[in-house]
Amino acid sequence: MSRRGTAEKKKAKSDPIYRNRLVNMLVNRILKHGKKSLAYQIMYRAVKTIQQNTEKNPLSVLRQAIRGVTPDLTVKARRVSGSTHQVPIEIRSTQGKALAVRWLLAASRKRPGRDMAFKLSSELVDAAKGRGDAIRKKEETHRMAEANRAFAHFR
């Protein structure tokens, strides 16, 4: 057994303008090459675009999008007697949110166009309405877990 204590879980910090943890999670995932100010710029422009286009509270749209994309189940490869099975496992809410943020950003990067803020805002609005690539990814993951339900006892 390890003599060290377990590492304490760090709480996600909130961003300076909206005081929101989800915004900060998104900013930290947008971040490339240490350019955090650019990541904040992209995020705040996306939020502004959401505000103008939907005329709703952009933070509620963001929350709704992340809630819609957050998966409940995922599959994990488990090797059993020489063959690898995709075993469905339940995931915690923090891990689910992290996956949702990752999928939203991947889907928005895939969208056509040059402006990342516009692509991100349109992906968030689509996800809040229940469509878009990120939602498709969640449904695909759930389908995989459902298809491999027979291997759930390998957990």
Curated annotation (Swiss-Prot):
GO terms for cellular component: plastid; small ribosomal subunit. CDD domains: uS7_Chloroplast. SUPFAM superfamilies: Ribosomal protein S7 (SSF47973). The keyword Transport does not apply. GO terms for biological process: translation. Keywords: Plastid, Ribonucleoprotein, Ribosomal protein, RNA-binding, rRNA-binding. It is found in: Plastid. The keyword Ion transport does not apply. Part of the 30S ribosomal subunit. This is Small ribosomal subunit protein uS7cz/uS7cy. It comes from Cuscuta gronovii (Common dodder).
